[in-house]
């Protein structure tokens, strides 16, 4: 039984009339769940079980569109989320980059809609007087699963499809980098995978242009997942570039082989120790440019670890080819990491070199970084409403 069948046959949160017609399919109905209102067209079926996040970051739920026979992931955001400037910037940044890269086949489609919960007949699942008023809904295509789910629930497929999945990630990031954009927050949880193992990215909340100054680069970056962050972003080197994406893909590559998480990364300090155990301790020259004195001193006092054999020991099922690529991707010094062009030319990918590659013919920037970071909640919400809302 497919997910859509489960949704259709479940206890639907859909008020009468239950028969979908041309005249009523686009009518909006509202519900409240855990004190939060959700507004959806009648043609989109949801259940309590398909609401899987309801917190200060918004309400995330899955719907099945009866019109298009497509599964969707929708995130509802109220003005409260925009009052957190970090959350607001993340949303606006994601909108800009999603729109810019939306035509690429490896980027998930999205759209934004604006809806009101007021003056609509409400079916209360949980008694609550709360009404969020006007909200924004971010809609994304739903894939069969995420790369995170694939790695942890189907290790055989993860291992077998490893070269294909990795090649797609590399060529997608190569395309994004060609636009002068660093993704910065690659994570298996934000990489969608379908049944043919084709991948799509669906989150650009921390993406940034290479023309951004260092102080702005690190302003929001503390919120990104530690296990996939490159060493130079942890110890805050003065320079940063596309190599931090190469590191993140290298970590994901290792997880595809392992079938589990490579680094626990519960804190900055523990992650630096784990990295040292994998690829050896760094030299003074490799971290002397750090702008974070505490991190620099901490890493220089880590007990010496050998630079040889750590990857093989940690990932014993990796082939010689895979170890060679991992050693080229996972280096303390970002300038010593293999560029993506070199990686995809490795014989390991010989069965996939026929896949079409794309290059962006123009650069993208959000404009003045200092102006962007001074935007307040109302300004951010207005920009999204004016520039990105595609339906009332």
Curated annotation (Swiss-Prot):
ATP binds at residues 52-60, 75. GO terms for molecular function: ATP binding; protein serine/threonine kinase activity. The keyword Secreted does not apply. SMART domains: S_TKc. One of its GO terms (cellular component) is nucleus. GO terms for biological process: intracellular signal transduction. The keyword Signal does not apply. Gene3D superfamilies: Phosphorylase Kinase, domain 1, Transferase(Phosphotransferase) domain 1. PROSITE patterns: PROTEIN_KINASE_DOM. Keywords: ATP-binding, Nucleotide-binding. Residues 46-349 form the Protein kinase domain. Pfam families: Pkinase. The protein kinase domain is predicted to be catalytically inactive. PANTHER family: MITOGEN-ACTIVATED PROTEIN KINASE (PTHR24055). Belongs to the protein kinase superfamily. CMGC Ser/Thr protein kinase family. MAP kinase subfamily. This is Probable inactive serine/threonine-protein kinase DDB_G0280855.
């Amino acid at each position: 039984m497919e997910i859509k069948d489960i949704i259709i046959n479940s206890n639907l949160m859909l008020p009468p009339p239950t028969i979908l017609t041309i005249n009523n399919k686009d009518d909006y109905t509202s519900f409240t769940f855990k004190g939060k209102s959700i507004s959806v067209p009648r043609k989109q079926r949801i259940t309590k079980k398909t609401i899987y996040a309801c917190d200060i970051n918004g309400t995330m739920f899955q719907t099945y569109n009866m019109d298009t026979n497509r599964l969707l992931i929708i995130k509802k955001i109220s003005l409260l989320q925009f009052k957190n400037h970090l959350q607001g910037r993340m949303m606006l940044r994601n909108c800009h980059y999603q729109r810019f890269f939306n035509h690429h086949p490896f980027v998930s489609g999205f759209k934004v809609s604006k809806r009101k919960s007021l003056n609509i007949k409400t079916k209360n699942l949980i008694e609550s007087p709360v009404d969020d008023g006007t909200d924004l809904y971010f809609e994304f295509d739903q894939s069969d699963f995420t790369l995170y789910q694939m790695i942890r629930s189907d290790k055989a497929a993860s291992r077998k499809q490893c070269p294909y999945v990795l090649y797609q990630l590399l060529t997608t990031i190569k395309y994004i980098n060609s636009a002068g954009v660093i993704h910065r927050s690659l994570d298996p949880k934000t990489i969608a995978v379908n049944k043919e193992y084709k991948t799509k990215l669906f989150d650009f909340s921390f993406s940034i242009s290479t023309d951004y100054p260092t102080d702005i680069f690190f302003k929001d970056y503390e919120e990104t997942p530690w296990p996939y962050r490159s060493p130079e972003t942890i110890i805050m080197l003065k320079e940063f570039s596309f190599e931090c994406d190469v590191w993140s893909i290298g970590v994901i590559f290792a997880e595809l082989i392992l079938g589990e998480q490579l680094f626990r990364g519960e804190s900055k300090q523990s992650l630096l120790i784990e990295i040292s155990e994998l690829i050896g301790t760094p030299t003074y020259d490799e971290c002397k440019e750090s702008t974070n004195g505490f991190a620099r001193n901490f890493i220089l006092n880590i007990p010496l670890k050998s630079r040889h054999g750590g990857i093989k020991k940690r990932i014993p099922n990796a082939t010689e080819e895979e170890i060679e690529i991992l050693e080229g991707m996972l280096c303390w010094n970002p300038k010593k990491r293999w560029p993506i062009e070199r990686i995809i030319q490795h014989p390991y990918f010989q069965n996939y070199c026929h896949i079409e590659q794309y290059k962006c013919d123009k650069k993208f920037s959000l404009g003045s970084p200092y102006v962007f970071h001074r935007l307040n909640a109302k300004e951010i919400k207005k920009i999204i409403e004016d520039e990105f809302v595609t339906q009332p």
